[in-house]
Amino acid sequence: WLRKYNSLDKALIIYVKYIVVVFVQSSPNRNKEGIIIIMDELLDLTRDFDAAKAAFEAYLDEYDRADDKIHLKIEHTYGVVDAAEDIARRMGLGEEDVQLAKVIGLLHDIGRFEQIKRFDSFEPGTMEHAAYGAQLLFGPEKMIRRFVKDDRFDSLICTAIEKHSDFKLEGITDERTLLHAKLIRDADKLDNCRVKLEESMETLLGVDEKGVGEGVIAPKVWESCMAKESVLSSDRVSKVDYWISYIAQYYDINFPETYEIMREHDYVKRIMDRVPYALPETQEKMDILAAEMEEYMDERIRNKK
């Protein structure tokens, strides 16, 4: 099955459909047509994502894949797709929402590539990549049609992408749109755990690990950490401020399932330990932050909220 269909999702759905057909054919009282229609719809969903992925790969040909920052964002995109699927399935979401989460993950950072091409930077001051990406997809040219032919979810996808990097998620009243806006934000942060461990520090922050650890944590940055809040970009002064802000952002997680994955991989402690902190005071603060955050995560997991 895998050799024939080149996709685990499609192979499983085809195989299950085969079993279902055999079962209903031997059970005349079953609604064979209804069950087969459902299986066909599930297969269509995986085909939709495969088509979107192929279109995304074609879009990437407009950029220099050999560029370290471009490469980082390509890997991050597919990491977010996997993270979104993992979280969604742990939450028990239906297959349509799982596939929708994957499509949003695929397109969430589409604005980043132009930002890197123009400015060679991830800094929010150079471009609001989320708003730019939403405009790119849903503006007059309707680039979204390259990736998703069905327009039923346009508003949901646009809102989720546009708000995925907002400091705080606000202003969404539709329940399903809010679900996916929260889900992409969690998936984005979850894969950023991997990024902070695997990518070179020079690509991330322009200096090596020692250079990151030489700074002093700014008072406003530490206040945000102790308030269990994300750090404002404008409050960051030194490279160590950036590094600690990457950890503090994990207070802004929506679903306990995301925290479960983070704890399984021991992400917070591993990210903190990547940098050698020159000042004892900085090391002490990082230890405090890691301990408090892990306690907070465990409480959210226990309470399932």
Kindly give the residue locations of the regions a language model identified.
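Short, Lys/Arg-enriched N-terminal segments with co-localized hydrophobic residues
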Residues: 15, 19-38
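Divalent metal-dependent phosphate-bond-processing catalytic cores, especially two-metal-ion Mg2+/Mn2+ enzymes
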Residues: 40-47, 69-74, 78, 82, ...
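Active-site flanking loop/helix segments enriched in acidic
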Residues: 53-79, 111-123
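An active-site-proximal "capping" alpha-helix that borders the catalytic cofactor pocket
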Residues: 79-87, 128-141
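Acidic/histidine metal-binding catalytic segments
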Residues: 92-103, 143-162, 176-183
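His-Asp-centered metal-binding catalytic motifs of divalent-metal-dependent phosphohydrolases/nucleases
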Residues: 98-125, 133, 137, 156-167
